[in-house]
Swiss-Prot record:
Protein name: Dihydroorotate dehydrogenase (quinone)
Positions annotated to bind FMN: A62, G63, L64, D65, K66, T86, N139, N172, K217, T245, G268, G297, Y318, S319
Subunit structure: Monomer.
Co-factor requirement: FMN
GO BP annotation list: 'de novo' pyrimidine nucleobase biosynthetic process; 'de novo' UMP biosynthetic process; pyrimidine ribonucleotide biosynthetic process
Entry's localization field: Cell membrane
Cofactor comment text: Binds 1 FMN per subunit.
Organism whose genome encodes this protein: Vibrio cholerae serotype O1 (strain ATCC 39315 / El Tor Inaba N16961)
Length: 336
């Protein structure tokens, strides 16, 4: 009830202004009596994945807390893990505004943010300060002005800096809002990137006496053949997990709606079925060898369960959380 009232007010604002206000309030309320408005005590539902123990299988997807400013607040809401970022080596402003749009009737969101963030060094300081006993995933990307052929260098820079502080590292090569980025999902480009990341992972594991798993985040806009090729690269390079999926460019389910023609990636309920199909295809190829983190359109216990039955080991929410609030986390965790 409280969230529905708050949402009514937030939804009167521009989508990005509402997001920024929410982040600001979470920062302000953390550790004060006001965090009672969103703090939840949820049952323990531990899950083993990537050699880590997650308090429960419901995580916050990357993109909501890009700079790691509200990790404790999201932990208080009952998330079993929190993924922050996407972060890049250098700060960048992202794409021009407006760049975030609600498709309210479809419970969807279109964004073309463009990896706006304050840079990896800023994020690392926030992660170091966070008082959160759950798993923190750190999602890394490349700067917009880094040529795609040198993209691996940006991922390695970020990896070096976040490695000591991350529970796992998510490699984002699937955002549709950085020109050319999705080309890294294919063929030799993917193999070369994954090989470089695994080599650096081994070096950093020896240096820090700590093994931090790598998860690759992929797009939903892939053919079955392309997914199979990605799976071959994942297996060949012994990547620890795959996150399925990022946002979609497909607009078939929202055609004619306000903002449907805005450029960017679509998330939320319109992505629900397609992301589950991708998970099924991944599981067919990977089985239990490489765990899958399912994300895309989860807005209820039922849709979360569908992802788990399709083969996902963990799930993440973002758009569903925007529309439903912390109660969505409780609904899923309590019913598992």
């Amino acid at each position: 009830m409280l969230y529905r009232l708050a949402r009514a007010g937030f939804f009167q604002l521009d989508a990005e202004k509402a997001h920024d206000l929410a982040i600001s309030n979470f920062k302000r309320f953390t550790g004060t009596p006001f965090d009672l408005f969103y703090r939840q005590q949820l049952p323990h539902r531990p899950v083993q994945c990537m050699g880590l123990t997650f308090k429960n299988p419901v995580g916050l997807a990357a993109g909501l807390d890009k700079n790691g400013e509200c990790i404790e607040a999201f932990g208080a809401m009952g998330f079993g893990f929190v993924e922050v970022g996407t972060v890049t080596p250098r700060p960048q402003a992202g794409n021009d505004k407006p760049r975030l749009f609600r498709l309210v009737h479809a419970e969807g969101i279109i964004n073309r943010m463009g990896f706006n963030n304050l840079g990896v060094d800023h994020l690392v300081e926030n992660v170091k300060r966070a008082k959160y006993d759950g798993i923190i995933g750190i999602n890394i990307g490349k700067n917009k002005d880094t040529p795609i052929e040198k993209g691996a260098e940006d991922y390695l820079i970020c990896m070096d800096k976040v490695y000591p502080y991350a529970g796992y590292i998510a490699v984002n090569i699937s955002s549709p809002n950085t020109p050319g980025l999705r080309s890294l999902q294919y063929g030799e480009a993917l193999d070369e990137l994954l090989a470089a990341l695994k080599t650096r992972q081994a070096e950093l594991a020896a240096k820090h006496d700590k093994y931090v798993p790598l998860a690759l985040k992929i797009a939903p806009d892939l053919s079955d053949d392309e997914i199979q090729q990605i799976c071959q690269s994942l297996l060949k390079n012994k990547i620890d997990s795959v996150i399925a999926t990022n946002t979609t460019l497909d607009r078939s389910l929202v055609e004619g709606m306000k903002f449907a023609n805005e450029a960017g990636g679509l998330s939320g309920r319109p992505l629900q079925n397609r992301s589950t199909e991708v998970i099924k295809c991944l599981y067919k190829e990977l089985g239990e060898e490489i765990p899958i983190i399912g994300v895309g359109g989860i807005d209820s216990y039922i849709s979360a369960k569908e992802k788990l039955l399709a083969g996902a080991k963990l799930v993440q929410v973002y758009s569903g959380f925007i529309y439903q609030g912390p109660g969505l986390v409780a609904d899923i965790v309590k019913n598992l």
